Amino acid sequence: MIKLRLKRFGKKREASFRLVACNSTSRRDGRPLQELGFYNPRTKETRLDAEALRVRLSQGAQPTDAVRFLLEKGGLLEKTVRPAETIGKLKQAAAREAAVKQAAKDAAEAKAAAANESDDSGTDSTES
């Protein structure tokens, strides 16, 4: 399978990346099948070979997450929401709602218990 990934080059702590097409089993900085673009994260400079990228994508090449973000930013791919992210966000929202409901329920129970205790202590003192 062909992957579209970033190949690191440059000095220490001054990395730049080439967007390349390569076999999925090859090393990160191994020899690519084709160079398709350039990305510098410090200056946010991005150069993409749009035609070559369209050809590779039509052949079934799979972009990594970082490359997918660059392609979406460059207008070569439509912005997609991954199902796992959506499900995770829905679960988090449901958990938050459940926690709020539980907190409200606990507060109501504590208030009722405090009211019952004050009523009980008031009746005990009048009887004594």
Curated annotation (Swiss-Prot):
InterPro entries: Ribosomal_bS16, Ribosomal_bS16_CS, Ribosomal_bS16_dom_sf. Pfam families: Ribosomal_S16. One of its GO terms (molecular function) is structural constituent of ribosome. Residues 107-128 are annotated as: Disordered. SUPFAM superfamilies: Ribosomal protein S16 (SSF54565). Keywords: Ribonucleoprotein, Ribosomal protein. Residues 117-128 have a biased composition (Acidic residues). It comes from the Bacteria. GO terms for biological process: translation. GO terms for cellular component: cytoplasm; small ribosomal subunit. Belongs to the bacterial ribosomal protein bS16 family. This is Small ribosomal subunit protein bS16. It comes from Synechococcus sp. (strain CC9311). The lineage of its organism: Bacteria, Bacillati, Cyanobacteriota, Cyanophyceae, Synechococcales. The gene is rpsP.
